Amino acid sequence: LHHVLGSVHPHLPQYKERYHHGDLEAFQRTYFEHLALAAESGLFDTIGHPDLIKNIEPEAYDLSRLMGTICETLDRIAATGTAMELNTSGLNKVVPEMNPGPEMLRQMREREIPVVIGADAHQPERVAGDFDQGLERLREAGYSMVSNFLDRQRIDLPIDAAQASLESQQV
């Protein structure tokens, strides 16, 4: 077993039935609370697509109102040493940006939270999809390293080395 990814899926009917009681902002805050609890459980190496909630009723997703909750969540995740995912499949979602978006990614960098890039590759053609853009987003946020896992041990690679590896695979 190389890597255990923990994700909260707020779009699933079971999750919505249990946690959405009419107050969308409270539902969003609960989602971030669950991300922190997942990291604190110690079960996961990485927390996946950490702002996926923005795709549920995106017109009601107000980052400025949620930033305090998000920062508290990131503080808790950082304290565990758990990595977080930059998920490139967000480019194909209702809110067409990676998960997390740029501001949350910058906040992760400020807390020195390691990042793994993922593509939610449910189809073979999506494997490593948009990883080049993901590496660029990491650079823009101030990261110089990207992480992956082998035998559940995190390995940090320079972004330039990861980029070179991607380019060599495209030949």
Language-model regions: role of each:
Residues 1-80, 162-171:
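Extended substrate/RNA-proximal surfaces in nucleic-acid metabolism proteins
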Residues 61-171:
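Charged catalytic cores and adjacent phosphate/nucleic-acid-binding surfaces used
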